[in-house]
From Swiss-Prot:
Compositionally biased spans, kind Low complexity: 118-129
Biased composition, class Gly residues, residue ranges: 136-172
Disulfide bridge positions per record: none
Family of this protein: Belongs to the myozenin family.
Subunit (UniProt): Interacts with ACTN2, ACTN3, FLNA, FLNB, FLNC, LDB3, PPP3CA and TCAP. Interacts via its C-terminal region with MYOT.
Species this chain originates from: Sus scrofa
Phosphoserine modified-residue sites: 82
The keyword Nucleus appears for this protein: yes
Gene this chain is encoded by: MYOZ1
Protein name, as recorded: Myozenin-1
Lineage: Eukaryota, Metazoa, Chordata, Craniata, Vertebrata
Role summary: Myozenins may serve as intracellular binding proteins involved in linking Z-disk proteins such as alpha-actinin, gamma-filamin, TCAP/telethonin, LDB3/ZASP and localizing calcineurin signaling to the sarcomere. Plays an important role in the modulation of calcineurin signaling. May play a role in myofibrillogenesis.
Protein's UniProt keywords contain Transferase: no
One cellular component term from this protein's GO annotations in UniProt: nucleus
Region spans: Disordered: 1-34, 105-173
Gene Ontology MF term list: actinin binding; FATZ binding; molecular condensate scaffold activity; protein serine/threonine phosphatase inhibitor activity
Amino acid sequence: MPLSGTPAPNKKRKSSKLIMELTGGGQESSGLNLGKKISVPRDVMLEELSLLTNRGSKMFKLRQMRVEKFIYENHPDVFSDSSMDHFQKFLPTVGGQLGTAGQGFSYSKGSSGGQAGGSSSAGQYGSGQQHHHQGSGSGSGGAGGPGSQTGRGGDAGTTGVGETGTGDQAGGEGKHITVFKTYISPWEKAMGVDPHQKVELGIDLLAYGAKAELPQYKSFNRTAMPYGGYEKASKRMTFQMPKFDLGPLLSEPLVLYNQNLSNRPSFNRTPIPWLSSGEPVDYNVDIGIPLDGETEEL
């Protein structure tokens, strides 16, 4: 407590009061308002990308256009009336007709001139399979299965699913083959593949056609030419080393060192004390050091 003046305020009581107010308010209400959590839906993001108002949306649109160049979808509009002209050359030569309502083409074979048979298709996209129907009977054609229609001679491209047809020829049996091929690649178009031949339905592009022999090209790679050309290089080397006189061999004098260690002088310096007078003093220094490095004291 200070000696003079007003006493210091109680800070601890003030802070506890503030904490009580915060905790009391939290119990009464649902909680503190910390703001709204950021959430951006996917639709809002795509909408911003489609506005083309900033650089990012423009780059996204250009990327979509580049990607669409390399994407080919199996869309039913591929087999429209305008695109059927490109597939006419792939039809069989006998009794073939390309359908416009379904995805597929069919043809009929028989042993006599008159032909009659049913037709079918594989729905919207087709299945890429072959169906062989063979039967005998009288009449122009028959229909079987749910959702079937009456077959007509040589027609194809009907929209019935699971339709089969039977027919009869004058004095022989009829054979109806339907080939569903919803996609013909540009490679097959360029090579002139006939889809009615079963052998050519699956094509190995690596084994297609005869492999031509590689042409014998001349090599223009530079190689090192010997000095004087190849004519001189083919001859044997006639160069010989010249003879020269090395002279007599002089022997070096052999130097023999004295191996007696006891006769070697000692250059170890000994301390000389201060002299008190001018009288000469003789000091006898014992230099009889044993040759052995270890002594009895050690």
